């Protein structure tokens, strides 16, 4: 991807999924967007690397609205403080929020909560919704959706 990125600068690459702190130095030169900021430790690492690389990716804070133990993300009760710390102390370019609602529940209440949280923080971008629920996500102002299965089919 690094070679292609240089040849096609108009392409913007998005990092989705868990970003490990030890991979940040490799991810920063490659990805224009990071959809999964989920901890202070990761925020610190991105801050250090963006200074070294002189590049600030556009970042979404991942929120664990379903309070699921198997998923990463900031608890909504800590979101405002986390956001302020990321912007003011770590100088991160936070542009939005991201969530993955519980798979076995109606996603609409979670999408509505994301819309409200984003409005409170005055963030314009919301990354939520996948092939099975993107239409619901769009009703609640999602600006980035993931529809790989709709385009390419289910994984085998």
Report the location of each language-model feature.
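Glycine-centered loop/turn positions within well-structured domains
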Residues: 135, 145
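Expand to "…catalyze enediolate/carbanion chemistry for C-C bond making/breaking, isomerization
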Residues: 138, 151-156
